[in-house]
A protein has these predicted regions:
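Zinc-dependent metalloendopeptidases
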Residues: 1-309
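Well-ordered beta-strand positions in beta-sheet-rich domains
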Residues: 103, 259, 341-343, 386, ...
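Low-complexity acidic/polar repeat-biased segments
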Residues: 290, 294, 302, 306, ...
Length: 472
């Protein structure tokens, strides 16, 4: 979605109220009108970090890039918004030094209908159009267009990834079929990445410990308790950019099975009823998620979200390369830390906890919990990479699952470990033993028969382990 045009220095904007503000002929001479208050507010939401409350900041171009916006003169501003009958729909001019550069024009083809450009509300066609045309005025090209730097790859050519494409869903043939409030509520990940490539990334916005929250009944997006996005219907369809700090997605109000993925470029679903209906595509016609994560800017991990507070149903939560804190709360949850030194807390229910790489802390909570380990590298003998289970309770049917690890790679197939209790390694490949101290237990596995541990798991309690406590 990159073009060959961008602004330099402060980007000024204006909402002219008189045709005489324009030095060129054409649009101004064909039913000129000033934009509505709703259009003005939508434009300010998308541009200005200082518009409204601080909750909006991260969703504005000024908030996620280093571009600086300021109110300018109606005759000379870089980006100007107005209405004309000349474009039947809407269009905008790229940045430049020519007279029309940066001007955004909205037509009247949909006047008096639900798609009227004068009535943008987060998630409707008019809102989407304003984001799209502002993108052009700042230097973004069409996502479906092979000009300039090429079109979006086919697997990303949908409004789930960019407001700049005409493709409503993967394979839509450059057409929109979404429901009335089924459009993106913000710039999406490809747009954010392109604008950051042009203007730099702002890591000061929401650089503290920010809490993002969504309401199951209305779809409102809250940032640190203040409403940032008030959609026209109970739909959530946005991308989050966060500048730094230790940040949290608080989804504790949800009673539906959450599907959360904190990895860059991935999407999370809070409630299927809050998914935007796109009219087709690989997810039964719906958007693949409610909230999408921004891509990393040049590999900088400060924009990652670190923590998740789950709901009361059966949640699936995947972390990222940061040190995540993931709390499942009630329900039979599946928690995965991905990379980083994570804290996974299942809460009430029969949970599965998979720390992944890093020295992870695993808390199953009440219920029959399963602690999964899938490779030797995920829990090392060295403390720097060793996982700790804090509440292994055999009487609650907690189990340690090693079944994915091949205990003997010299034999075809996935071999199971042989549990030898507290006995020393004998030199057999695939032996599993444990040591119990006064208040700790250490589990060791030898996969190559050299009588040395190849991985270790720490239990924060003295437990007399038995073969039945493992899934081998």
């Amino acid at each position: 979605v990159l073009s060959n045009a961008a602004w330099y220095g402060t980007i000024t904007y204006a909402f002219p109220t008189a045709a005489g503000s324009y030095s060129y002929s054409g649009e101004k001479n064909s039913g000129f009108a000033a934009v509505s208050t709703a259009q003005k507010n939508a434009a300010l939401f998308a541009m200005e970090q200082s518009f409204g409350s601080a909750a909006n900041d991260g969703f504005s171009v000024e908030g996620f890039t280093n571009a600086s916006f300021a109110l300018g003169n109606a005759s000379t501003a870089s980006v100007r918004f107005a209405q004309s009958k000349l474009p039947s729909t809407a269009y905008a001019y790229y940045p430049g030094t020519y007279a029309e550069a940066g001007d955004v024009w909205f037509g009247t083809a949909y006047a008096g209908t639900v798609n009227d450009y004068r009535t943008p509300v987060a998630g409707n066609y008019a809102w989407h159009t304003l984001l799209h045309e502002l993108g052009h005025a700042l230097g973004l090209s069409h996502g479906h267009d092979p000009d300039d730097f090429g079109a979006l790859p086919a697997q990303y050519n949908s409004i789930e990834f960019s407001v700049m494409t005409y493709s409503g869903f993967i394979g839509s043939g450059n057409a929109y079929w979404y429901e009335r409030f089924g459009a993106p509520q913000t710039f999406m990940m490809a747009d954010i990445a392109a604008l950051q490539e042009m203007y730099g990334a702002d890591f000061t916005t929401n650089s503290g410990n920010t809490v993002y929250k969504w309401t199951p009944g209305s779809g409102a997006t809250l940032v640190n308790g203040a409403t940032a996005i008030a959609p026209g219907a109970n739909r959530i369809f946005a991308t989050v950019w966060d500048g730094g700090g230790n940040d949290t997605y608080d989804l504790s109000a949800y009673r539906t099975g959450l599907k959360i993925d904190l990895r860059p470029g991935q999407a999370s679903t809070f409630n299927a009823d809050q998914l935007a209906y796109l009219g087709g595509g690989p997810n039964d016609g719906f958007a693949r998620g409610n909230i999408f994560n921004a891509l990393l800017y040049h590999g900088d991990t400060r924009s990652l979200i670190e923590n998740v507070l789950g709901g009361s149903a059966n949640d699936s939560i995947i972390g990222n390369q940061a040190a995540n804190t993931v709390r499942g709360y009630a329900g039979n949850d599946a928690l995965s830390g991905d990379r980083g030194n994570d804290l996974l807390d299942g809460g009430v229910g029969n949970d599965s906890l998979y720390g992944g790489a890093g020295a992870d802390r695993l808390v199953g909570g009440t219920g029959a919990d399963r602690f999964l380990f899938k490779s030797l590298a995920e829990t090392t003998v060295a403390t720097t990479g060793r996982d700790t289970i804090y509440d292994f309770v055999a009487s609650q049917s907690d189990r340690i699952d090693l079944s994915t690890i091949d205990a003997n790679t010299t034999v075809t197939g996935n071999q199971a470990f042989v549990f030898v209790g507290t006995a020393a390694f004998s030199g057999g490949k695939g032996e599993l033993r444990y040591d119990r101290a006064a208040s700790d237990t250490y589990i060791y596995g030898d996969v190559n028969g050299d009588r040395k541990a190849d991985f270790a798991i720490h239990l924060d309690d003295a437990v007399a382990m038995q073969k039945g406590y493992f899934i081998l």
